[in-house]
């Protein structure tokens, strides 16, 4: 068995999903060229039709996985209706994938304020100027709004829009997947019945 296969296979013995996630994310940060914190976010509309898009993970802990968005956007509205979501991380350079399913909660006002102020000034202006997911007549309309808000907040702090905040996905299941030859991949699934539970059930899955 090669050293790489042996190293990749070691994860199958791990007992704590958040520790394993942290390890894989750290390794992806080194090997992945673009946005190692990018994740696919899946939601469903009121008819059950799924939507998926890429967003960026901005924080994680044993409480869950955090990203930020406009609550009036398509994804924001779909999450607010169901308060459920699924995430997928895929790191091609490592040939690894993580699937997460869980319930969603809003981050606190303090968390949202702190993160919003850490964003580049142009991004904060954009949060005010963009009516995310709404029809846009042409690019000029958006650029005009950007100019207006740039002038309005030319001096001093830019406040966080009331409709712009974050969500935390609190996982009920986390599955780790690692590529192996002949599609005989390694899969390790952690599940729990409630997000209040500290202990996880752990099982290996057939490829």
UniProtKB/Swiss-Prot annotation:
Binding, FMN: 53-58, 68-69, 75, 97, 132-133, 177, 187
Question: What GO MF annotations does this protein's record show?
Answer: FMN binding; pyridoxamine phosphate oxidase activity
Please give the pathway this protein is involved in. Answer: Cofactor metabolism; pyridoxal 5'-phosphate salvage; pyridoxal 5'-phosphate from pyridoxamine 5'-phosphate: step 1/1; Cofactor metabolism; pyridoxal 5'-phosphate salvage; pyridoxal 5'-phosphate from pyridoxine 5'-phosphate: step 1/1
InterPro entries cross-referenced by the UniProt entry: Pyridox_Oxase (IPR000659), Pyridox_Oxase_CS (IPR019740), Pyridox_Oxase_N (IPR011576), Pyridoxamine_oxidase_dimer_C (IPR019576), Split_barrel_FMN-bd (IPR012349)
Flavoprotein: present as a keyword of the record? Answer: yes
Summarize where substrate binds, as residue positions. Answer: 58, 115, 119, 123, 183-185
User: Superkingdom of this entry's organism?
Assistant: Bacteria
- One GO BP annotation here? pyridoxine biosynthetic process
The UniProt keyword set, sorted, is:
Flavoprotein, FMN, Oxidoreductase, Pyridoxine biosynthesis
The answer to whether the entry has keyword Oxidoreductase is yes
Reactions mediated catalytically: pyridoxamine 5'-phosphate + O2 + H2O = pyridoxal 5'-phosphate + H2O2 + NH4(+); pyridoxine 5'-phosphate + O2 = pyridoxal 5'-phosphate + H2O2
Q: Which cofactor does it need?
A: FMN
Q: How is the cofactor bound?
A: Binds 1 FMN per subunit.
**EC number per UniProt:** 1.4.3.5
The subunit field of the Swiss-Prot or TrEMBL record says:
Homodimer.
The family database entries (HAMAP family) matched by this protein are listed as: PdxH (MF_01629)
Q: Which family does it belong to?
A: Belongs to the pyridoxamine 5'-phosphate oxidase family.
Question: Tell me, what does this protein do in biology?
Answer: Catalyzes the oxidation of either pyridoxine 5'-phosphate (PNP) or pyridoxamine 5'-phosphate (PMP) into pyridoxal 5'-phosphate (PLP).
Q: Under what name is this protein listed?
A: Pyridoxine/pyridoxamine 5'-phosphate oxidase
- Organism of derivation: Bartonella quintana (strain Toulouse) (Rochalimaea quintana)
- Gene from which the chain derives: pdxH
